[in-house]
Amino acid sequence: MSLQTLQTELKAKLRQYQDFPSKGIVFEDILPIFQDPKSFQQLIDAFKLHIKDTFGDKKIDVIVGLDARGFLFGPTLALAIGAAFVPVRKQGKLPGKTVHAEFQKEYGKDVFEIQEDAIKPGQTVIVVDDIIATGGSAACAGDLVTKLKGEVLEFIFILELLFLKGRDKLCAPAYTLLSGQE
């Protein structure tokens, strides 16, 4: 199946909720993709096609998934391409020694962490999450990978809220599978 066909079928699965979680917000619900095994497989297939088209035979060592929705598909994608999966979590959720970085949220700051031995110097990394909005959390994850001397090749998202220009904050190119709100 072509990437374009996969995108069309996956886009049809999305639901929108007006005024959620607050008035004036249109919430893009990706969960129906994960509730249907065929759609979930199509999501992984679409990302695999993109990675193959973009990087050819270049080895991707690590998929980094952001807390929490990057955990929905990050491990499955990592397994599908023969890469390791490494979680980036909110502060205090990972055991052992960690490296941390702050990022700005709508109403204050938050902190992400990664285990300090999770990525080896020189490893190639793709960072994944469900949606890129302001780009703060994704940029923070990229900073953590860089602190561990990994090479961020790309950021991959299911959706993007283009009007927030989050990709401008990222340290590597961004790929969005489905078009989101303009």
From Swiss-Prot:
It is found in: Cytoplasm; Nucleus. The lineage of its organism: Eukaryota, Fungi, Dikarya, Ascomycota, Saccharomycotina. This is Adenine phosphoribosyltransferase. Pfam families: Pribosyltran. Gene3D superfamilies: 3.40.50.2020. Disulfide bonds: none annotated. Pathway: Purine metabolism; AMP biosynthesis via salvage pathway; AMP from adenine: step 1/1. Belongs to the purine/pyrimidine phosphoribosyltransferase family. AMP binds at residues 133-137. The gene is APT1.
